[in-house]
Amino acid sequence: YKIPGRVGDSPIIGAGLYVDNEVGAAGATGRGEEILRTCGSFYVVEQMRSGKSPQEACEALCKRIVDINGGTKNINFNDKIVAVSKDGEVGCASIKEKKGNTPKLAYWSKNGFNVYEGTYLIEVT
């Protein structure tokens, strides 16, 4: 289901999904307009290329989205980002969450099923 007039970012390469075999991959969900505006998944992969971990790269995108919207007082939406490096390191972050409700990423690795707890920028009540 999609609200009429809303933009879907998921099928747009570089926005909802981006993969580079030399670096890793990232995916995003939430307010599509913000993910499109920042080329969100591409941005995360490029942050990893420059040396950031997947977690740091996801957090960097959340901060970028908040900054280009004029700060936390203007954030009335949420975006969530996941990333994996070519070596299998993962990360996830969201712009806002309730206290104690950290974003999580479920994934399969050579060690079996795992759940990774990420971070968020803004705590909501």
Q: Where in this protein do the model-derived segments appear?
A:
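N-terminal nucleophile
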Residues: 1-125
